[in-house]
Structure formats: C-alpha cells, structure tokens
C-alpha cells in the first residue's frame, strides 16, 4: 500500500526544489526528515511539510506504521509560470518568469526480508 501527498503551485522554481527532493528519494522517513532539517535550502521546509503530510496520510488513511515507511517516489513537476515585467533602460521592459512547482511525495511500507 502507498500513501501520497502533493503540494501544488509552490512559489519556488522546480529546478531548485529538485535539488532537495533528489537528496531524500529512496530513503527511510526518519533519515529523510533529518536530512531536510540539516539542508540549508529554501525548498527544504516545504518538502519536509509535504513529507510529513504523506506520513500522516499513511498512518491515518491506511493504518501503516510510521517507523517502517520508505520514500518510494518523490518528484517535482512545473506549475503555472507567473509572468512579470521589469523596467529597463531606454523605455524598454524585460520579462521575469516567476516559476511554480508541484511537489509529490509517495511513501510505502518497507518490505521485510
């Protein structure tokens, strides 16, 4: 059985969130939370919140044991991009893309043996 949590339209660029998500993929839940607590990146608290939500979903909805959970999938997709303009010299303007992310974390119970 697997439990999943998704955070949509998080205002951090997907490229930056992927750096954090790559650190925890395939790890045990306790180890992943420790890694996120000691990673100094802006996306770390957001990814930790999604992971804790996935753990809570596993415990509440599927009655899994939190100590035996492993992160089976963790991925980041690109959300909608907010397009903004920055004034430049000579009356010109350049476009600023404010990118958003959809963060998904899936946890499963560790296979015994």
UniProtKB/Swiss-Prot annotation:
Sorted alphabetically, the Gene Ontology cellular component annotations on this record are: cytosolic large ribosomal subunit
GO molecular function per UniProt: rRNA binding; structural constituent of ribosome
**Keywords recorded for this protein, A-Z:** Ribonucleoprotein, Ribosomal protein, RNA-binding, rRNA-binding
Specify the superkingdom: Bacteria
GO biological-process terms attached to the record: translation
What InterPro entries does the entry give? Ribosomal_uL22, Ribosomal_uL22_bac/chlpt-type, Ribosomal_uL22_bac/org-type, Ribosomal_uL22_CS, Ribosomal_uL22_sf
The yes or no answer to whether the keyword Transferase is present is no
Membrane-spanning ranges: none
Listed under subunit, the entry gives:
Part of the 50S ribosomal subunit.
What PANTHER family does UniProt report for this protein, alphabetically? CHLOROPLAST 50S RIBOSOMAL PROTEIN L22-RELATED, LARGE RIBOSOMAL SUBUNIT PROTEIN UL22M
Q: Which family does it belong to?
A: Belongs to the universal ribosomal protein uL22 family.
Q: Which HAMAP family match?
A: Ribosomal_uL22_B
Instruction: State its role.
Output: This protein binds specifically to 23S rRNA; its binding is stimulated by other ribosomal proteins, e.g. L4, L17, and L20. It is important during the early stages of 50S assembly. It makes multiple contacts with different domains of the 23S rRNA in the assembled 50S subunit and ribosome.
| The name this protein goes by in its record | Large ribosomal subunit protein uL22
């Amino acid at each position: 059985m697997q439990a999943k949590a998704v955070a949509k339209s998080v205002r951090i660029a997907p490229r930056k969130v992927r750096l954090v998500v790559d650190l925890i993929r395939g790890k045990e839940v306790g180890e992943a939370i420790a890694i996120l607590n000691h990673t100094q990146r802006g996306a770390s608290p957001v990814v930790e919140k999604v992971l804790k939500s996935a753990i809570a979903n596993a415990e509440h909805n599927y009655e899994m044991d939190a100590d035996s959970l492993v992160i089976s999938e963790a991925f980041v997709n690109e959300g909608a991009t907010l397009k903004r303009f920055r004034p430049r010299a000579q009356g010109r303007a350049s476009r600023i893309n404010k990118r958003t992310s959809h963060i998904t974390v899936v946890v499963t119970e560790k296979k015994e043996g």
